[in-house]
């Protein structure tokens, strides 16, 4: 089965024709924290660009920061005093936290740092800078000249939606008052570069389109941008792709006003966190950021989550027990890619998903420390990072001859596993080694089995986990001890719970002499 990004790349080549360079675009208004749902737009554009690059084409990925949009409302986490900045460009509203040059920069800066960790070739542009240096001046003037055409297009869709037509004094743009920087009403245009405006503070004045104070309204700005940059592909959320929405009107405006065709698009669904109710909102503050994911996920896994889901399927990221399954799945796909494991009829698609989840094709499989087991090891207080690596080698989870690249990856996973246990792991996964035996009285038959395991461990300084596992089963089987009762007793003995991690691996990771003493109920 063809990966969806490859399908889209082929469609772009077919419909847009062979080009020296294809342009893909994504865009976000930095009105609040840019969360993992917003990131889906950028990643969808990126991965289609990735597929085009893999076919030998040059690709320019523009991510447009719509930071010349107006500040519409004061978010819950911002002081109410910021009401005085309503109507100003978000790029000119002060940063409430005082650490960046503006409100918009606070959110843009963080997101750009987060994206850099994914090694994605993206060119971040700021709409405020492009408007202010007059880059869009010609296109803005064209929109003024085509005011009648634009109104006719918009009114056609408004009629279908049973909305009243636009008023005769409507203009395809608005002005930021040069003095107060508030959104102002346009009241006249001189037919060339001059635009007359009325400021909400009460005064009137003229401004030149080329001075950067005139900004196109969203339904005109979007198609203008497609034309200006020659955009071939831009994904969009379903609100922008519904019938009569900004994509529909944009297709007609770019053709009628700018003489070009709209880019191809893909609708992407929401991204949420499993167990979280409602839609994430950067201005409401109920969000998960990429930096939150980086606390528990390798960058490759973050990319993998988005690459494996078709854009029209909602993503629910499970930061609980499901995260262990995600690591297992990613490691399996990685082994399939390197031919170490066979797929189940889906081999080629899985390999391609993996390729699109990494910035460049890796030359070898870097050591995979099983995250599920690391979540156990990081809870053993006597183990240092070096001890954990030694345990992984000893139990055969990673090779003996580790390169620095291997060690770096293992250390990263250790850190991520520790974070996961502290922040997201359910109680059933957490445990503490008891300072005294969790059981004081044991059935004589079970006690006998415990002593036999203790004797075996005492006489085997070096052993394989499989050998210990076999002994654990054998001593119980020959005494007709039910497995559930036997294992439950051992878990209670060490961690005071009925259940726990894989027992043989767990016991093998503990100090051997301590395990022997505990099995003998000596401490």
Curated annotation (Swiss-Prot):
Pfam families: Anticodon_2, tRNA-synt_1f
Reaction(s) the record says it catalyses: tRNA(Lys) + L-lysine + ATP = L-lysyl-tRNA(Lys) + AMP + diphosphate
GO molecular function: ATP binding; lysine-tRNA ligase activity; metal ion binding; tRNA binding
Intervals of motif 'KMSKS' region: 279-283
Residue ranges annotated as motif 'HIGH' region: 30-38
Organism superkingdom: Archaea
GO biological process: lysyl-tRNA aminoacylation
Recorded GO CC terms: cytoplasm
Cellular localisation: Cytoplasm
Enzyme Commission numbers on file: 6.1.1.6
NCBIfam families cross-referenced by the UniProt entry: lysS_arch
Full protein name: Lysine--tRNA ligase
Protein source organism: Pyrococcus furiosus (strain ATCC 43587 / DSM 3638 / JCM 8422 / Vc1)
């Amino acid at each position: 089965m063809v990966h969806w990004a490859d399908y889209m790349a082929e469609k772009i080549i077919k419909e847009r024709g062979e080009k020296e360079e294809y342009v893909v675009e994504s865009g976000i208004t930095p009105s609040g924290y840019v969360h993992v749902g917003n990131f889906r737009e950028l990643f969808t554009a990126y991965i289609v660009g990735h597929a085009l690059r893999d076919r030998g084409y040059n690709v320019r990925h523009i991510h447009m920061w719509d930071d010349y949009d107006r500040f519409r409302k004061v978010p819950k986490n911002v002081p109410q005093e910021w009401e005085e900045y309503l109507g100003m460009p978000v790029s000119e509203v002060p940063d409430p936290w005082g650490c960046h040059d503006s409100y918009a920069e606070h959110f843009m800066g963080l997101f750009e740092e987060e994206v850099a960790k994914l090694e994605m070739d993206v060119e971040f542009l700021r709409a405020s800078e492009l408007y202010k240096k007059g880059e869009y001046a010609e296109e803005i003037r064209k929109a003024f000249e085509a005011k009648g055409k634009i109104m006719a297009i918009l009114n056609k869709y408004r009629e279908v939606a049973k909305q009243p037509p636009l008023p005769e004094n409507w203009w395809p743009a608005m002005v930021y008052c040069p003095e107060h920087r508030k959104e102002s009403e346009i009241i006249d245009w001189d037919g060339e570069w001059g635009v007359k405006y009325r400021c909400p503070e009460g005064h009137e004045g003229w401004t030149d389109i080329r001075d950067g104070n005139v900004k196109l309204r969203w339904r005109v700005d979007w198609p203008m941008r497609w034309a200006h940059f020659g955009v071939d592909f831009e994904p969009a959320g379903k609100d922008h792709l519904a019938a009569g929405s900004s994509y529909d009107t944009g297709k007609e405006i770019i053709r009628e006003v700018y003489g070009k065709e709209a880019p191809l698009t893909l609708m992407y669904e929401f991204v949420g966190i499993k167990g979280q109710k409602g839609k994430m909102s950067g201005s409401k503050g109920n969000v998960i950021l990429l930096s939150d994911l980086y606390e528990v996920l390798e960058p490759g896994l973050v990319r993998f989550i988005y690459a494996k889901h078709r854009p029209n399927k909602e993503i629910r990221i499970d930061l609980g027990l499901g995260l262990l399954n995600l690591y297992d799945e990613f490691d399996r796909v990685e082994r399939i890619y390197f031919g170490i494991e066979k797929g189940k009829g889906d081999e080629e698609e899985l390999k391609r998903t993996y390729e699109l989840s990494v910035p460049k094709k890796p030359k070898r499989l870097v050591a995979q420390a099983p995250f599920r087991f690391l979540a156990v090891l990081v809870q053993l207080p006597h183990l240092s990072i070096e001890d954990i690596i030694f345990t992984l080698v000893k139990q055969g989870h990673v090779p003996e001859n580790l390169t620095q690249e291997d060690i770096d990856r293992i250390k990263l996973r250790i850190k991520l596993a520790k974070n996961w246990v502290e922040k997201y792991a359910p109680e059933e996964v957490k445990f503490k080694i008891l300072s005294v035996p969790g059981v004081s009285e044991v059935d004589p038959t079970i006690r006998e089995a415990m002593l036999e395991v203790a004797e075996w461990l005492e006489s085997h300084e070096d052993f394989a986990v499989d050998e210990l596992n076999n002994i654990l089963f054998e001593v119980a089987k020959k005494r007709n001890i039910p497995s559930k009762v036997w294992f439950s007793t051992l878990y209670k003995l060490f961690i005071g719970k009925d259940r726990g991690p894989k027992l043989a691996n767990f016991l093998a990771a503990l100090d051997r002499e301590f395990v022997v003493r505990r099995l003998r109920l000596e401490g």
